[in-house]
Amino acid sequence: GLWQLIKDKLKDAATGFVTGIQS
C-alpha cells in the first residue's frame, strides 16, 4: 500500500544518507 511505499522511500533515503556520511 501507500504506507509501504513511503517506508521504502524513507529507508532508501536513510541508507543513502548514511552511505554519504561514511564515504
From Swiss-Prot:
Expressed by the skin dorsal glands. Keywords: Amphibian defense peptide, Secreted. It comes from the Eukaryota. It is found in: Secreted. One of its GO terms (cellular component) is extracellular region. The keyword Secreted applies. Its main location: secreted. One of its GO terms (biological process) is defense response. Has no antimicrobial activity. This is Dahlein-4.2. It comes from Ranoidea dahlii. The lineage of its organism: Eukaryota, Metazoa, Chordata, Craniata, Vertebrata.
